[in-house]
Amino acid sequence: MARSGYTLPVFACAAAIAALQHLKNLQAELDPIEGPLHSVTLDLINPPQTVEIAIEQVAKLGPGTALAISRSDPGDNLDITRNTPIWAVVTWAEDQQLDSIVIEGGEGIGRLSSTNDRAAIYAYAQHLLQTNLQKLLNSTEKIRVTIILPEGRSLAQRTSNAAFGIVDGLSLLGTSGISQPLSAPEQLEQFQTQLQQKAEQRKHLVFCLGENGLDLAQKLGIDTACLIKTANWIGPMLVAASLEGVEGILLLGYHGKLIKLAGGIFHTHHYVADARQEILTAYAATLGLPQTDLNVVFNSPTTEAALQHLRHLDQTTGSQWVAQIYTELVRQIDQRSQTYIQSQTNHRVIIGSILFDQQRQIIVSSPGGTALREQVTMA
């Protein structure tokens, strides 16, 4: 059985707790010994459980400042952050600081290019840090927390972060503290078990490939009881949903991933098949995009870059290429997904799709996607 681990925000939080505890001990004149601090406990919040996280080192850096170091352990997941160190620097803040806890991203934490280079520390990580650290503060104490990933900048070069507008480092992303081994065969069984449980309560579900989709879904007000994480197993999950009697499925995903379904590719890992530019170019060609622009789309380094070219073309010429091409893409995604399900189960399931860009802005929603979104949105 594959071993689960913890997500990056958990280790950042553990290091911050250790650094704050060190400061509290200094403040109480307990004269703590600097060096290894075996572990700290923290509340994951999601799921609601307390865990113990190892701490490698803790030390005083200066007056009112301490540093603690943890190390990432994502379990058996194929994760590039395995064993990477996570630093947290905690400093007593001045009285004029309005908030009791201010969280900042230091070296190796990515910046969101779309939001004035704000640190890529997302909602779950913020909530995790705020909740666990607040428990250690009295009503008058204030701290400033800086999270540092010494290897973050170099590790980010091996990710698709840039496609989501995250530059210069990694993000503290996720909606859960548990890191499941997405690449292990057992993971598909876990996804299908979760689907079976939710299908007993809901007849309309939302499939999200990863954390970006799950995060956007919650911001859109979609009922979390309808959310299913599929990773790259879209085909098997569509079939499983059909066999469980699900009546409608909303596919919510990054256009650079879901576009593969328009080409009949139902396992979306790039090691299996990566024809994103070819699919986008083919649909653009059938709709009459000029040859010069087809060449640009085909040779773009990412689907995001190709989308930006089409948007620029629309802005400068008054054309509607983005709307035309992406409307056809979601139509085909819906149709091919329904055909795929029927070929495997002989059942008919309503499919709708919504594609978003790197800034998590919706590009297009199919008619089915719009209708299903209404079905799964909380009142």
From Swiss-Prot:
Its EC number is 2.1.1.195. Disulfide bonds: none annotated. Pathway: Cofactor biosynthesis; adenosylcobalamin biosynthesis; cob(II)yrinate a,c-diamide from sirohydrochlorin (anaerobic route): step 6/10. One of its GO terms (biological process) is methylation. GO terms for molecular function: cobalt-precorrin-5B C1-methyltransferase activity. SUPFAM superfamilies: CbiD-like. Pfam families: CbiD (PF01888). It comes from the Bacteria. InterPro entries: CbiD, CbiD_sf. Keywords: Cobalamin biosynthesis, Methyltransferase, S-adenosyl-L-methionine, Transferase. It catalyses: Co-precorrin-5B + S-adenosyl-L-methionine = Co-precorrin-6A + S-adenosyl-L-homocysteine. Belongs to the CbiD family. This is Cobalt-precorrin-5B C(1)-methyltransferase. It comes from Cyanothece sp. (strain PCC 7425 / ATCC 29141).
